[in-house]
Amino acid sequence: MKPTVWHHLRLCPHGHPDETIDDAAIAVDETGTIAWLGALSALPHGYAHWRREDLHGAWVTPGLVDCHTHLVYGGTRADEFAQRLAGVSYEEIARQGGGIVSTVRATRAADETTLFVQAAARLQPLLAEGVTAIEIKSGYGLDLASERKMLRVARQLGERFPVTVHTTFLGAHALPPEYAGRADAYIDEVCDRMLPTLADEGLVDAVDVFCERIGFSLAQTERVFEAATRRGLPVKLHAEQLSNAGGTALAARYRALSADHLEFLDEAGIEAMKAAGTVAVLLPGAYYFIRETQLPPIELLRKHGVPIALATDHNPGTSPLESLLLTLNMGCTLFRMTVPEVLQGVTRHAAAALGRADRHGALEVGRQADFAVWSVGSLAELAYWIGRPLCEQVVRGGTTVFRRMNG
């Protein structure tokens, strides 16, 4: 690529709307790395001969990060949506053989090509909203071959689309039917066979567990964490969504990258997260979709200074959400977060939840030039508008990979 100076832009380099530069410029070298940024009036003379790209006063933020998704799976669960509307709880559906296990059946039956095509269709709306990094979990295979298939598809998405994909092995997502009544035996399989094999194949960036009364116990979760730690892999946790099971404190002991959901999180768990540097990932799409009433403890998270990230939690059962911008709005309207909080929640803090705050979530000299260009008058509009296409252009590694066509 040709070295380029992107200029006449309003720059928000760290995702905080109170830290901006008017009439700014970003100089990107031939490797796609940011060589300089700041006020256009201070642009060094050495960049005078570089190609110019005029953004006509548009806002520029770091590329967005969706740090919790289950994007690869077979089928849908629209029928269960109707059941929930009729009063059947998520837990009841799961106990009747629905829920996660129904998606497991569909995912096992699908081949890699089918899973790729379906996941690609879910990914593209996110890319058109400025997402340049995304986490994709496994967890709908629940056997070695199917978990491998999911993670291979996730890797392929990162190779064939302009987005950095971080993969998370979530083999301990639910108990597969063939292990009914034998949860400890299944955890043996996860720890002794599935995780080592998939890690050796280079398919795993992090390890997650669903720690809940309808998922896995603290003791079982710790076994998975121990297996991940032996492999040098960071851990994450689905925690305190339906009850306070104490999973967050356990995650903090293992210095988890993040603990996610957290509606029933208590102050002791928050203190443990703060001490461990664990990010709180809140998922308002799931809260909305399954009509939860227990709000996550936003004020306590603020009080203790725990970084808060937001994500779509895209999945077929509890959050079939394909808009990170709508997630911003939900964070404000449902969880009473501020605009600075939600914007940092999908940039700097979301990157930290992936363990890659050094790579994503900010625009700084020496970093890859991943940024989004917005047709808004103020950054508050990113959380304000519902359904309006706001992203005009996405740049990844200094190259435009998306441009909205007018009309």
From Swiss-Prot:
Residue positions binding Fe(3+): 68, 70, 238, 313
* UniProtKB keywords: Cytoplasm, Histidine metabolism, Hydrolase, Iron, Metal-binding, Zinc
Enzyme Commission number:
3.5.2.7
Q: Which cofactor does it need?
A: Zn(2+); Fe(3+)
Query: Record-annotated residues binding N-formimidoyl-L-glutamate?
Result: 140, 315, 317
What Gene3D superfamilies has UniProt attached to this entry? Metal-dependent hydrolases (3.20.20.140), Urease, subunit C, domain 1 (2.30.40.10)
Instruction: Give the binding site residues for Zn(2+).
Output: 68, 70, 238, 313
The record's InterPro entries line, in alphabetical order, gives:
Amidohydro-rel, HutI, Metal-dep_hydrolase_composite, Metal_Hydrolase
Recorded GO molecular functions are:
imidazolonepropionase activity; iron ion binding; zinc ion binding
Q: Copy the pathway line from the protein's UniProt record.
A: Amino-acid degradation; L-histidine degradation into L-glutamate; N-formimidoyl-L-glutamate from L-histidine: step 3/3
PANTHER family assigned: IMIDAZOLONEPROPIONASE (PTHR42752), IMIDAZOLONEPROPIONASE-RELATED (PTHR42752:SF1)
According to its UniProt entry, what is the function of this protein? Catalyzes the hydrolytic cleavage of the carbon-nitrogen bond in imidazolone-5-propanoate to yield N-formimidoyl-L-glutamate. It is the third step in the universal histidine degradation pathway.
This protein's name: Imidazolonepropionase
